[in-house]
């Protein structure tokens, strides 16, 4: 009879980070919020879809507020006190998400707009009439 081998189970160690970076990508259709440590490793994330919205409602400021609230609660639970915020995109959920992080009791260090702007790159699509 074959001898049974024991499996070694690795336990996930409790993560404590005092400072983090919040990346808010706000498009017209959705808002995606990612919380990383200063090195860029993802800790948690949320979006309009994970907050329970479907279709065009994912792009609303309220959906961004709920998604940011989920991420902020997770950050506070991990013991995070200070965050820097990087905002990308033209969507309507930008300000709502930033206000939610302030209301959650997190100290905001820097709010920076990192929306990519072309230096006369690709030709844009023709104008819709």
Curated annotation (Swiss-Prot):
GO terms for cellular component: ribonucleoprotein complex; ribosome. It holds the Pfam family Ribosomal_S11. Keywords: Ribonucleoprotein, Ribosomal protein, RNA-binding, rRNA-binding. One of its GO terms (biological process) is translation. GO terms for molecular function: rRNA binding; structural constituent of ribosome. The keyword Transit peptide does not apply. Gene3D superfamilies: Ribosomal protein S11. Located on the platform of the 30S subunit, it bridges several disparate RNA helices of the 16S rRNA. Forms part of the Shine-Dalgarno cleft in the 70S ribosome. Belongs to the universal ribosomal protein uS11 family. Part of the 30S ribosomal subunit. Interacts with proteins S7 and S18. Binds to IF-3. This is Small ribosomal subunit protein uS11. It comes from Thermosipho africanus (strain TCF52B).
């Amino acid at each position: 009879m074959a001898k049974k081998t024991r499996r070694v189970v690795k336990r996930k160690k409790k993560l404590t980070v005092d400072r983090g970076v919040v990346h808010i990508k706000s498009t017209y259709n959705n808002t995606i919020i990612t919380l990383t440590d200063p090195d860029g490793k993802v800790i948690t994330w949320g979006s309009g879809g994970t907050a329970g919205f479907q279709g065009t409602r994912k792009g609303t400021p309220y959906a961004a507020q709920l998604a940011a609230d989920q991420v902020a609660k997770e950050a506070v639970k991990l013991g995070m006190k200070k965050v820097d915020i990087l905002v990308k995109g033209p969507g309507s959920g930008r300000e709502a998400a930033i206000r939610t992080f302030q209301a959650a009791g997190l100290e905001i260090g820097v709010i920076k707009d990192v929306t990519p702007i072309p230096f006369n790159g690709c030709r844009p699509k023709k104008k819709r009439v």
